[in-house]
Structure formats: C-alpha cells, structure tokens
Amino acid sequence: MKRQLITMILLLLVVAIQGIRAQEPYATLSSDNTTLTFYYDNQKSERGGMSVGPFSLANNPSWYDQCGSIASVVFDDSFANCTSITSTAWWFCACNSLTAVTGLEKLNTANVTDMSFMFSNCRALTSLDVSHFNTSNVTDMSYMFVHCEILTSLDVSHFNTANVTNMSHMFGECNKLASLDVSSFNTSNVTDMSYMFSTCSALTLLDVSSFNTANVTNMHDMFDYCLALTSLDVRHFNTAKVTDMGSMFRMCRALTSLDVSSFNTANVSDMGDMFQSCSSLTTIYCNDTWSCTNSSYMFWGCPLLKGAIAYDENKTDATYANPDTGYFTRTGGTSVETLNAASGQQNNEACYSLSGQRLTAPQKGINIIGGKKIVIK
C-alpha cells in the first residue's frame, strides 16, 4: 500500500513539473529527415527538439545539413499559441526538396523583424500561402524567396513593408511567377533593391509606379533578365542617393520604351550594362546628360535604339547617355517633326547629323535639332 502511494505521489510530481515547465517553440526532424515539424509546448527534451533561432549565415539551423532531404514542413496546432518568434531567417533555406508547407497560418509573425533567406532556394515549391503574414515589424526581407524557381503564384499584396530596409534579391530567380502584386509596398525606408526582381523571367507586368525610392542606394540588377516585361513605369523613381545602377535593365528584351527622365544620376558610379541586350528597346526618354565612372557596355545589344543618333554597336558607353548626340529622346514632344528648310533651325539651336556630326546648318533629310529628330524637306 505504501509503495503504491509513493508511486502515485511520484507520478503526480512528474505531472506537476511538466505543467510548471515553460512552454517554448522548437522543431523536430523525422527519423528519415523528410519532415520538419514545429511545436510550442513543454516537451522539447522528450521529443529531441531543436532551437528555432534566431539564425544567421554564421549560425545556421540545426537541421541545415539535412535540409536537402526535407520534403514537408508541418506547423503543429500548438504553434498557434506562440507569440515569441522574432526571426524566421534561414528557416527553410536550401530546402530544395520541399514541396509542402502545412499549417503555415499557425505561424504568428507579429513580432518578427527578420525574414531574410526564409524560403531561399526552395526550388521544388509550386505554391506558398503567406497572405496572412503580419510583417509590420520586419526590417529585412532580403533573399526571402530567391531561387523559388517553380513557384507559380505568390500573394504578397498585403505585406506591410513600412519598416523594411533591405529588399535585395527578395524575388530573384522566381522564374515561373507570371504575376506579382507589389503595388501597395511602402518602400520609404528601403536602402537596397539590388537584384530585387532579377530573373523574374515570366513576369509580363510589374507595377512599381508607387515605389518611394528616396533612400535607395543600390539598384544593381534590379530588373535584370525580366525577359517578358512589356512595360515598366519608373518615371517617379527618386534616385538621388543611388550609387549603383549597373545592369539595372539588362536583358529586358520585351521593353520597347523606357522613361528615366526623373533619374538623378549625380551620385551613380556604376552604369555598366545598364540597358544591355534590351533588344526591342527603341526609345529611352531622358532630357539630361549622364556621366559615370563605369559605363562599359551600357547600351550594348540595343540595335533598335534611336535617340538623337541612330544606334552604333561601337558606341555603347555613357558618352551616348544624352539627348543631343546620344541615344536619349527628350520628353514632351514628337519623336520626328517635319519642317521646311527655312524654319528648320530655331534660335540658333545646335544641329547634328544622325551620326552625331555637328552641322553648321540643317541639311535635307533627318537632322537632330535641339535634341529632336527633324526632317527637313
């Protein structure tokens, strides 16, 4: 009888201790390394649970070495009670066999500040529902979806990005995304947009017209390899702080015109390959003359481009980034005007041939007068 009483007391003590033990978030990996499950309870030690971070490049998740085998991620019902997560950075990075995420709606992101690399290199994911994410405190979204190469849909239209400073590589290499709504993004605090949409090669439309870029310093490769984009409105971009525009529009092969008349390039040191291989581009609207330390191949591979002069494959650097003797076309007028010889030159405006040669007077045919193409009869 005494022995049974002692046993019962011990059992009650165990239950009491378990009840007192604090709940905590953790993750477990199945014995075959294919399923990663997230819990929030007091059984971490019993389940052999692993810490859920915060993680970084120097401090990877405990499951990182097995991430290539993970095919399924599950959020247990208990995780809905967890409000202590401050970082989801690197959680599923390089899970290139991951095809299903179950219960993601149970992840409370209200206090999360870092989502960098969260789904980076999830190359097998075809769908992902992040529409419920509360991102009001997030400051870093860099590399968040980079290399999600067969993801066909992604709803980020409700993301609150008011505090985000880094969007570098955010959607880079999302090759199969046919649409992406970022029109509501508040980018007033973003400083880095490099590679943000790089190689989103299936996108045909992208509305960035409301982007506030006043604090952005890096736009390198921002729209690089957006092969299917047929239009892109960057007319309101404030680029006063930008130092790098290298390869910004490279390989945007479907664009036929681009208005960069608002661009302030006073601080830009790199324009190399900026419009390289925009093979359908005929018109770049800009009233200013640009200059830059590095501008090699800036206009290379743009055979249809015509501004003040016709395109010459041997003239592809920033020397020709102007509307008077280069490839820019001034805004606010028709591209070609027809005048009589007597009225062809107004107010002693500079006159050039299509090859860029300074003329003393207009000649019959096409002339460049005041940065406009003028046909003299």
Segment roles from a protein language model:
Residues 3-4, 366-377:
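C-terminal tail/sorting-segment detector
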Residues 93-94, 117-121, 143-147, 168-173, ...:
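Short beta-strand elements of solenoid repeat domains
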